[in-house]
Amino acid sequence: MGTYNLVSQNNISVKNSSNEPLKFPWAGGMNSMQYCELDLNLDGVFDLLSFDRRGNRKLCFINKGLEGIADYEYDAQYSSLIPDISDWVITVDYNLDGKKDIFTYSPGYAGIIVYKNISDQELKFERVVYPYLKTMFPGGYVNLFVTYADYPGIADVDGDGDMDILTFGVLGSFIDMHKNMSMEKYGNADSLDYEHYTYCWGHVAESDESNHIYLDTCFSGGKNYKSLQTPRHSGSTFLVHDLDDNGLVDILLGDVEFPWLYALYNTGTIDDAHISYMDTLFPGSTDEINMFSMPVAAYIDVNNDGLKDLIASPFDPGITNSQDKRSVWYYKNTGHNTNPDFEFISEDFLQKNMIDMG
C-alpha cells in the first residue's frame, strides 16, 4: 500500500458571491467572539486578539490600518505565543507598564488566572497567580469567584489607577466589587491585592428569573428587591466604562438567553456608585444590539482614529445561539471616548472574509 503526504495549503485564493477575494478565507470562521487589544508584533500599535469561545480558539490579527481605516491581516503564528485561554479573556494593563496583560478563566476553580505581559524582543507572558486570583473577605483571602458563564468587568472603578473587578456574587443578584488595594498599600499599581469592597455595587439588582433590572435597591432607603438566599440564574457579561462623561464608570450588561445589551448609568460618587437609570435599546432605538443570546461587548479602537469603537458578539457558545456569518457586530464611535455615539457599520466584522462551514 502506498503512502501519502498531506500538506496544508492556506494560500489558495477564494472569492465571495460578488467575485471579491476573501482576505483570510482559511482562518476558520467565527462564532462566539471576544475581542481584545494587544500589541502582538511589538510595533507600538494595538493589534487584535480574538477568542472564539466555541472551541476556545485564539485568532490573531495584525493591525495594518492607517488613521481612520480598519485593516487587519490574519497571522496564525502569534496564537502559539498566547497562553492557554478558557471561556473568556480580557486584556488590561494592570501594572501600568504600557503592556496589556491577560485575565482569563481558571478551569476547575471558578476563578481568574492572570498572565503578566513580559514581552521584550518577542511576545511573552508569565503566570502570576496560582491557582487563582484571591480577594480578602473578613475571614481571610479566598478565591475571587467568577464562573465560566460570566464575563467580569475589569477596570479602574474607583479612579485610583489600579484595576478593580465587578462581577455577580456567589449568591443573589447583586454586583460584587473587588477593590484592588495596590495603590493604597504600595503606592503603585503593580500588585493584584484585592479586597471585597461591597456586595451591592451600584444599588442595583438583576432578577434571578430574567434580565429585569431593579434600581435603587440593596440598602435601607431603597426597594429591597430580594435577600441573598436564592442563587440567581448563571450567565452575564460586563463592559465597564464611562459612557456619559461624568467621571464615573457605567456598565453594559448582557444576560443569558436574552439578545440585548442594557446600559446602566452611574450617577453616584466614586466611593458609592448608584445606577439611577438605564437604556434598554442600547446603542439606539433603530440599531440596538439584538443577537440570538447574551451579547458580550468590547470597547476597542477598530479603525485607528483614537476613538474606542464597540464590538458585540454572542458570549453563549451554544451552536444555536450564534450565527456564523453575522455574529460580530461593529459600531463605529463618532463621539468621544467617555461620551460615545455609535454608528452601526456591519454585523460580520472580519468574519465576512472567512469561509465558515458550520
What are these regions (language model features)?
Residues 1-358:
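Beta-propeller-forming repeat regions
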